[in-house]
Amino acid sequence: MPAFDLTAPYSPKGDQPTAIKQLVAGVNDGERYQTLLGATGTGKTFTMANVIAQTGRPALVLAHNKTLAAQLCNELREFFPNNAVEYFISYYDYYQPEAYVPVSDTYIAKTASINEEIDMLRHSATRSLFERRDVIVVASISCIYGLGIPSEYLKAAVKFEVGETLNIRGQLRELVNNQYSRNDTEIARGRFRMKGDVLEIGPAYEDRLVRVELFGDEVEAIRYVDPTTGEILQSLESINIYPAKHFVTPKDRLDTAVQAIRSELTERLDFLNTEGKLLEAQRLEQRTKYDLEMLGQVGYCNGVENYARHLAGREPGTAPECLIDYFPKDWLLIVDESHVTCSQLQAMYNGDQARKKVLIDHGFRLPSAADNRPLKGEEFWEKAHQTVFVSATPGNWELEVSGDEVAQQVIRPTGVLDPIVEVRPTTGQVDDLLGEIRDRASKQQRVLVTTLTKRMAEDLTDYLAENEVRVRYLHSEIHSIERIEIIQDLRLGEYDVLVGVNLLREGLDLPEVSLVAILDADKEGFLRAERSLIQTIGRAARHVEGVALLYADNMTDSMAKAISETERRRTIQQAYNEKHGIVPTAAGKKASNSILSFLELSRKLKTEGPDADLVQVASKAVEALDDDADGMALDALPELIDQLEMKMKEAAKKLDFEEAANLRDRIKQLRQKLVGKV
């Protein structure tokens, strides 16, 4: 029996069955690298889901940013409602790494804010990998950073079993050793309390409580309990409580690590003094001895991750354990948007080492701090036994290592063809474009325009606005939430044209866009390379009347290749449609997803007014806060804060952490208003 239960209202169509069959056969035959070359709108995620389901392998789906990871996770959870689809990204809301700027003699201490909801999801991912095989973890590049030793994490788990006789004091001590804190007043994640014969634990990976009921020293019952209502949700025969932190260091290993750090410090001080670097030596000695004192007394210090190599007992230069090491041996890696993601893997290591070298050279850290690092590219690929690369424009390296194992997915189940590509001269390009925009706007269609520079984009936006075109400008200084709202407004018809420098961002799947205009298409460079052009042209590939206009005076190699590839895909789709009698139909994709739900709710409130429920009123307060916060009644603020907190938690559960962070900031503002009015 397969481990995964794929649920979908449709079956594979077009190129999907062939691609799925080829990829599944490759995985089963032990092929190390394969590539799914899938055009925009061909259902690559559904193909990925089928490959996972038919191979039955625990899978890691790697994305190059957390927004794309959240979208993939939401889609895969819809396909696999009965399996464990987990989300693993960096748990920092804010992160400023430790750094030193020699030129200005400026030391920047590490500052960070941890998102507890994301931390819970990370723990949930590793717990699932220990307890079941039907696991899909959707992760960002942060999964290549150190994550403790899986065997130590598993060994440290505290087990409870019905009918078992316990040494309850010993069990409580183990929970404390696993970094759970006792709080008999308020129970929460990472805490426990003991009242009479009832032990309640807030696991690091659950939003439910675990209640262990005792009769004397015997476990009488184990239950999952709702933390708010106290309602019994489920009875269990046994349970493992995993540590509250992934980094678990037994006492004997901690003692050994402290000795190793002392030894390295002595050696490094000798070197610095010999080199005449007396200031650096003094700085290093003072900082490290303080850290050693903290480690010896409480087992922790600020910046403890810099001693990770010693705490893990690793040899110098060896790779750290990371999320990959929690997977069983037969796991499957799927790299989404591989043309971007693969290049990021090596870049993460290089950037980390450059910063650490400065800290080490100037006496802020021991040389072993360099081993607190992400995996190198080659280390990552050594750990990845079987890989499927997924991209509309796979990179040369992916295609090279895949060899003949490339599955083509060009045909769209909707029958929609790739855009018609036209090349027009640059003379009079703006006026020509204006006419095309007016034509599309009259048909309730949308337009994307990409320029080479920010200045060009600004000037074009101003010109179009002066000519009564409803236009917006998308640029790098716009924050994530506002960026999402701009894209949402385009889809909803609040305006007709979106202008930007680089509109290749993943997630820009806009079925309403029928025209993509690329200005200065013949200016060779990153933004006008073959892959970039194909990606940009593909933004119009979801519309039945899709057209891409390339304004250029010369035909570059990149343009020729991009046009040729688009025409090839268009010809294949056309032949398929004629053979099967398919009439192209636009994908009926709604202008909403988990990331945009809050924005939709805000719009709804503008028309519903006082008839909206409390949660909606709270959301409206967010919209009005900057303009009318001073006019709010004092007694209304606490209720609004409560409702916003509920909304924030709902957003986090939907993996919409950008919305959650926005709500968190608004709550903070409301609290400040409340304090100021009391």
Curated annotation (Swiss-Prot):
UniProt: ATP binding residues: G38, A39, T40, G41, T42, G43, K44, T45
Top-rank taxon: Bacteria
Any Pfam family the entry gives: Helicase_C
Disulfide bonds: none
PROSITE patterns on file: HELICASE_ATP_BIND_1 (PS51192), HELICASE_CTER (PS51194), UVR (PS50151)
Chief location: cytoplasm
Subcellular localization(s) per the UniProt record: Cytoplasm
Free-text note on domains in this protein's UniProt record: The beta-hairpin motif is involved in DNA binding.
Similarity section: Belongs to the UvrB family.
Alphabetized NCBIfam families for the sequence: PRK05298.1, uvrb
Name this protein carries in UniProt: UvrABC system protein B
Organism of derivation: Synechococcus sp. (strain WH7803)
Source organism phylogeny: Bacteria, Bacillati, Cyanobacteriota, Cyanophyceae, Synechococcales
Gene: uvrB
